[in-house]
């Protein structure tokens, strides 16, 4: 259905009965010449407006704001009701301007206070308003012509704003019942006519206005649905400026408007031409101009305030005089027509004239801290003033930033191609054939699309380095069908074949596409790679196992293939040993040389530690009174180590330095063994004194060698 909102048609019904000529009792100072008054002249008495004048001024202000911001497609029909109903204009676009309405109102004139009140009623105007809503506007006729046989798809909605002086709540209820009955009667007439349209929805706004100082006989009531066609609300408002404020609030609610107050506007004073003062001007515009402020919430922005006696908040922007080139301005993301709230005030007229002369005004956000942020600009185009929204953050024309930024830098390996395929599989489209749920009720296509999206995103890694199976072409047959709501027998067989192929790949020890980004070395070993792959595949299948029994069969097949027999584990161990040997063989000779030197230095360090322990133990034994004095001994050293050290042809290694230091320290600690000093070829003869004492010949004493 082509939607025409309730704001497309607005019918004003203003009471023109005699009681509307009563004074509103809100005085206005007529004589404002308080200075330089000649002596003896009596000032003019203050005046007060009638209820009729207050109602017309407030309704005209409503229409002015609407025409300023929405010059097209928002229409007003003005009706005056007394002894009958008189329509001041039509739905034609040519009649939609304030000049036509003001000229028609001038012809009608104020209500006659001497007229018979019994002959006057607001009901005449309400009935005429319902008839007017049934008439087709040019925009509705254009839409009906485009749709041809589907012309009934064009909606007809409208709003009736009635300003009157009601007697009581029961009188208001009678007016609502009259409107409700009239709508049903005219809908029956419109059903059989090609020139009328049935009313699908009508919003009735009843405004009871009364003089200032009197008690209201009518109570306020929020929106209430009286029927499937009529919604009504009641406002009880004092006349004068209170009525104007109420209509100002309603026009913002009815047309989704927002308020912006321009502060610190420099203006020359009339009395003092050389000085200037700062003024404020409040503007109304569409609320989309404040979308950027939602993004700025919590970033130091401090420009929202509530106006007195107003439901809506206003956003404060400061007049800005930047020292930057216009080329440095951000891109404009939107332009919205504006309308001053107090159009006749001197600051408003000065600002509008300044803009209509071709000038532009930059506006900045008042912030508690931080740098200046220019968020809006006022400028005129073709005699109309627009509020331009400037992008205060990243330009919408630039490439978006990286989704996340980790400790290693921006993430760049997103699965962009896979995500494009994912969007293609989950795009929304019209669904012609109706489907039914298990309980027999109709299945909503939107809910079905949400369920499919939920299934596809149960396990979907976003980064290439975080997944293994989605980088393997061999897993595609399983990953593409496991997300289905129900599997066929052929799907189950394809999934099982995929699992068997993976088992065969593991048996052949085929490499896997494991990402080594951000890791040092060669990455995980082959069996560890397959363990990661099987774990991820199990996570994917387990996320969808509750779908059906066939999903469970795929899961059972996967778990059965993961449990390996003992001979398979033994083969894996042999494979790991072979890989270790291959890695050692692949090491360069320089690396092996460094390892040997390191092992030798470790051996020397362990020898030194043992020496220290022996020395400490010897000191303890020596200090005890009962222990004999131990002989001085030299630690066991290899024979080849005792030889003279060859001079190195190059720089000495760490091992040579340690060996030289150890030999020097040992030579200083102990006296050399007498037998070693007198030995021949490092062999000493023992017990020589026994031969000399006994004089025995040919007796060979025991010999020992000590190294």
Swiss-Prot record:
Residues in coiled coil: 567-622
Highest taxon of source: Eukaryota
GO cellular component terms attached to this protein's record: cytoplasm; INTAC complex; nucleus
GO biological process: cell division; flagellated sperm motility; regulation of fertilization; regulation of mitotic cell cycle; RNA polymerase II transcription initiation surveillance
Biased composition (Basic and acidic residues): 565-625
Compartment(s) of residence: Nucleus; Cytoplasm
Stored Pfam families: Mat89Bb (PF10221)
Region of interest: Disordered: 565-651
Residues spanned by motif Nuclear localization signal (NLS): 573-583
Keywords recorded for this protein, A-Z: Cell cycle, Cell division, Coiled coil, Cytoplasm, Developmental protein, Mitosis, Nucleus
Residue segments, region Cleavage module binding motif (CMBM): 650-695
Family affiliation: Belongs to the Integrator subunit 13 family.
Domain notes: The cleavage module binding motif (CMBM) mediates recruitment of transcription factors.
Self-association and partners: Component of the Integrator complex, composed of core subunits INTS1, INTS2, INTS3, INTS4, INTS5, INTS6, INTS7, INTS8, INTS9/RC74, INTS10, INTS11/CPSF3L, INTS12, INTS13, INTS14 and INTS15. The core complex associates with protein phosphatase 2A subunits PPP2CA and PPP2R1A, to form the Integrator-PP2A (INTAC) complex. INTS13 is part of the tail subcomplex, composed of INTS10, INTS13, INTS14 and INTS15.
Function statement: Component of the integrator complex, a multiprotein complex that terminates RNA polymerase II (Pol II) transcription in the promoter-proximal region of genes.
Protein name (record): Integrator complex subunit 13
Organism: Xenopus tropicalis (Western clawed frog)
Taxonomic lineage of the native organism: Eukaryota, Metazoa, Chordata, Craniata, Vertebrata
Gene that specifies this protein: ints13
């Amino acid at each position: 259905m082509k939607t025409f909102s309730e704001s497309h048609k607005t019918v004003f019904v203003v009471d023109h009965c005699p009681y509307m000529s009563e004074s509103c009792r809100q005085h206005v100072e007529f004589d404002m010449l308080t200075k330089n008054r000649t002596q003896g002249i009596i000032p003019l008495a203050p005046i007060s407006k009638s209820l009729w004048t207050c109602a017309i001024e407030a309704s005209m202000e409503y229409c002015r704001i609407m025409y300023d911001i929405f010059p097209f497609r928002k229409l007003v029909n003005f009706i005056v009701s007394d002894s009958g109903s008189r329509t001041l204009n039509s739905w034609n676009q040519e009649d939609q301007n304030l000049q036509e309405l003001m000229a028609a109102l001038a012809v009608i004139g104020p209500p006659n206070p001497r007229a018979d009140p019994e002959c006057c009623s607001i009901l005449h105007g309400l009935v005429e308003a319902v008839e007017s809503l049934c008439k087709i506007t040019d925009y509705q006729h254009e839409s009906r012509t485009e749709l041809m046989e589907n012309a009934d798809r064009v909606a007809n909605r409208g709003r009736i704003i009635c300003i009157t002086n009601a007697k009581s709540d029961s009188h208001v209820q009678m007016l609502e019942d009259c409107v409700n009955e009239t709508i049903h009667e005219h809908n029956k007439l419109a059903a059989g006519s090609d020139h009328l349209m049935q009313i699908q929805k009508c919003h009735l706004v009843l405004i009871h206005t009364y003089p200032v100082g009197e008690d209201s006989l009518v109570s306020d009531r929020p929106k209430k649905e009286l029927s499937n066609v009529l919604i009504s609300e009641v406002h009880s408002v004092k006349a004068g400026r209170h009525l104007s404020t109420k209509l100002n609030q309603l026009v913002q609610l009815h047309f989704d408007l927002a308020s912006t107050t321009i502060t610190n506007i420099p203006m020359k004073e009339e009395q003092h031409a050389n000085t200037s003062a700062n003024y404020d001007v409040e503007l109304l515009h569409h609320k989309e101009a404040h979308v950027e402020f939602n993004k700025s919430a919590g970033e130091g922005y401090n420009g929202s305030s509530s106006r007195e006696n107003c439901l809506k908040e206003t956003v404060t922007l400061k007049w800005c005089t930047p020292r930057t080139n216009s080329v440095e301005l951000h891109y404009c993301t939107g332009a919205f027509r504006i309308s001053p709230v107090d159009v006749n005030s001197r600051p408003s007229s000065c600002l509008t004239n300044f803009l209509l002369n071709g000038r532009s005004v930059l506006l900045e956000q008042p912030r508690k801290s931080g740098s200046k942020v220019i968020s809006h600009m006022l400028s005129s185009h073709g005699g109309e003033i627009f509020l331009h929204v400037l992008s205060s953050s990243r330009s919408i024309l630039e490439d978006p930033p990286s989704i996340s930024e980790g400790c290693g830098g921006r993430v760049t390996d997103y699965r962009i191609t896979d995500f494009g395929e994912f969007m293609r599989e989950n795009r929304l489209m019209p669904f012609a054939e109706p489907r039914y749920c298990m309980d027999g009720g109709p299945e909503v296509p939107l809910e079905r699309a949400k369920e499919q999206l939920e299934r596809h995103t149960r396990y979907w890694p976003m980064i290439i380095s975080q997944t293994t199976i989605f980088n393997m072409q061999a897993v595609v047959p399983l990953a593409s069908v496991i997300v289905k709501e129900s599997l066929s027998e052929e799907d189950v067989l394809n999934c099982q074949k995929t699992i068997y192929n993976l088992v065969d790949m593991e048996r052949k020890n085929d490499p896997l596409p494991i990402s080594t980004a951000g890791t040092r070395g060669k990455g995980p070993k082959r069996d560890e790679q397959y363990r990661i792959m099987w774990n991820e595949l199990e996570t994917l299948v387990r996320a969808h196992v509750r779908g059906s029994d066939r999903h469970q069969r795929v899961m059972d097949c996967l778990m059965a293939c993961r449990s390996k027999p003992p001979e398979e584990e033994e083969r894996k161990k042999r494979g790991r040993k072979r890989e270790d040997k291959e890695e050692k063989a692949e090491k360069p000779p320089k690396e092996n040389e460094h390892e040997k030197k390191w092992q030798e230095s470790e051996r020397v360090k362990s020898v030194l530690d043992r020496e220290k322990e022996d020395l400490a133990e010897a000191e303890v034994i020596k200090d005890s009174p009962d222990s004999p004095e131990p002989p001085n001994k030299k630690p066991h050293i290899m024979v080849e180590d005792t030889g003279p050290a060859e001079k190195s042809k190059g720089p000495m290694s760490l091992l040579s330095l340690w060996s030289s230091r150890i030999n020097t320290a040992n030579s200083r600690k102990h006296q050399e063994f007498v037998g070693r000093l007198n030995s021949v070829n490092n062999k000493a003869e023992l017990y020589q004194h026994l031969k000399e004492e006994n004089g025995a010949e040919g007796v060979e004493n025991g010999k020992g060698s000590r190294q």
